[in-house]
């Protein structure tokens, strides 16, 4: 799968789940379960409830995603 196939969307973290998973509400109102990308995990970037994040979704499963950026 090419990297360009992923969909990036903005959202807000609503809930923290076990194993570094988060429930994120996207700007269009959809709810997504997302995990932290490897670079964010490696650099110890903390994500809290209420943070604005960028979520990367694949076109195959739009209910799961990867958090790739935390806005300030």
UniProtKB/Swiss-Prot annotation:
One of its GO terms (cellular component) is cytosol. Its main location: cytoplasm. SMART domains: S1. InterPro entries: NA-bd_OB-fold, RNA-binding_domain_S1_IF1, S1_domain, TIF_IF1. One of its GO terms (molecular function) is ribosome binding. Transmembrane segments: none annotated. It is found in: Cytoplasm. Pfam families: eIF-1a. Keywords: Cytoplasm, Initiation factor, Protein biosynthesis, RNA-binding, rRNA-binding. Residues 1-72 form the S1-like domain. PROSITE patterns: S1_IF1_TYPE (PS50832). Belongs to the IF-1 family. HAMAP family: IF_1. Component of the 30S ribosomal translation pre-initiation complex which assembles on the 30S ribosome in the order IF-2 and IF-3, IF-1 and N-formylmethionyl-tRNA(fMet); mRNA recruitment can occur at any time during PIC assembly. One of the essential components for the initiation of protein synthesis. Stabilizes the binding of IF-2 and IF-3 on the 30S subunit to which N-formylmethionyl-tRNA(fMet) subsequently binds. Helps modulate mRNA selection, yielding the 30S pre-initiation complex (PIC). Upon addition of the 50S ribosomal subunit IF-1, IF-2 and IF-3 are released leaving the mature 70S translation initiation complex. This is Translation initiation factor IF-1. It comes from Salmonella paratyphi A (strain ATCC 9150 / SARB42). The gene is infA.
